[in-house]
């Protein structure tokens, strides 16, 4: 097991995910505020509802409808059986499960600016973990790669954060990657939506090269009972390249990408732009949060900035 280290952020090599580096992020995450929404039956619920549910809620009982009750909480079965309008009453959980879904596909092991995408993804995941611990929530993980996955059950406090960090260190190493393309994201989403507790906050960290036609259905169903944020990890070279000849490989085959002509650069940039826009449009269509992390960005700064927007945004 790994233990706590100094809060002074160590300098990593940008290639390997370091436990010391992820642990040190804790000192910078104390001000991060994960999205929260009071349950509809709460007396503290305001007039402007955030898009996020916040902590999960458990069904407590049904009672006679009272003026001012939220119609979305009507218990139609009891209403039909008794002939009198009834509404559901919920009890808020003390701890909200926060699940980091992390893509460890081969396409993550790429980077031309400061760090690999895999390292940036690991740092973002750790920052989310520390923010959850700070709020008193439980943090867990679901990591996936071609043909394999690992689940880390949500746990509270330092124990939960350290279990997540241990998983990140184990999974996000260049020598562990498999060859070939990315794992279909829909495969991971299907597994997650069958295991995540209602009311959870699910943060999906990926480059979204594994996006496929089935993601729409699984994301839609996941969003019914959980709050979802997508985080796309990017490298500048994936959507824009200067003129030149670039040897590239997917681990199995190699070729040369020639961007010496304007037409070829335009095609490359057009493909890169589609890759930027398609996952963002999908997540926004389902009213999910969205943020983008470049390999030369500071993950804690990006998370803090985007969370301030997400927390204050009404439905």
Regions found by a protein language model. Give the residues of each.
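Exposed, interaction-prone extracellular/peripheral surfaces
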Residues: 2-51, 59, 64-69, 78, ...
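N-terminal juxtadomain amphipathic helix
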Residues: 71-73
